[in-house]
Amino acid sequence: MYGFRLLALFCIANLASPAYARVDTVYTGHQQLAKNVDQEYNYRVIETALKLTEPEFGDYKIIVQGDGDIPKQRALEQLLKINGAFNVVLVPTQPEWEEKAIPIPIPVRMGLLNYRFLLTHKDKLATFGTIHTLETLLPLRVGLRKSWATWEVMQQQGFNVVNAYSYDTLFSMLDMNRFDYIPRGIYEIYDELKSRRLDYPNLVIEPNLVLVLPTPYYAFVSPHAPRIAERLTAGLTMMMEQGILRNMLYQHYGEALEQANIGARRVIHIKNTTLSEETPLDKKHYWIDLFNASLTP
């Protein structure tokens, strides 16, 4: 379905396109770029996909819009506008994004966000020692933001979800016992805790559990930029098939993966019923299996 929709948009756009060479310009938000290791990875993915497709598509440039983090809903609004601030955004997939923008169903982090550790208060550790199944985890209060992809998923699965109105208040609310834990990606949680150690010395990473919740991280393109979508699809496919994306993943997140020692933890699987039929779950080489993978490319 995505491929047909993208082809139609691309053909329509090119009916009015001049024959001379063009420069493909990607407009993306500051939160997509080199503010930290996580955002630097997003930038390198975009840049590499564009670079690999130069022989077919020609020159390109990347323009950064804004000077700070952009809320996801505002980013989507800009993505959908003609001449909006962005024409490419990388985020965990959600139904609204797939319906309104052009999704490129290639998981740019190879499912690394599927694996989540729990940030909690040290006084709660004994409680988590008794958790071995999804059924025993459900009654505990989980802190999330409504804009996160995990919100709808965990709501549907019967979790006791508590809303935090901003990213920063999550940590203060956890410290004040407003909820019991925050599930965070294994490549996120260590830096998040380290940067807040002085403010919240009682917050810790629960040492024995890992949640596995399928959360593909896609590039989304404006419906007004079908050529960019066509180009990124080609570039990301090359990156995946040639092992470039996997190598990049280990370069950026290898240290966090080694620190995680995920194989020693009890595993709780959570279904993601919001995923579309286009999710490439059958393409095993698109996904990293941390329980059976080497920590080198």
Q: Residue locations for each model-derived region?
A:
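Bilobed "Venus flytrap"/periplasmic-binding protein-like clamshell domains
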Residues: 35-51, 118-158, 170, 187
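N-terminal signal peptide c-region/cleavage motif recognized by signal peptidases
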Residues: 16-18
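Acidic, polar ligand-binding/catalytic clefts
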Residues: 67-137
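Ligand-binding clefts/hinges and TM-proximal coupling segments of bilobed small-molecule sensing domains
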Residues: 145, 149-156, 236-296
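Periplasmic-binding protein-like
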Residues: 32, 112-117, 121-124, 198-230, ...
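Short helices/loops that flank or line small-molecule/ion binding pockets
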Residues: 65-86, 156, 168-188
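Extracytoplasmic small-molecule ligand-binding "clamshell" domains
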Residues: 21-99, 232
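A ligand-binding cleft/hinge motif common to bilobed small-molecule-binding domains
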Residues: 80, 87-100, 182-202
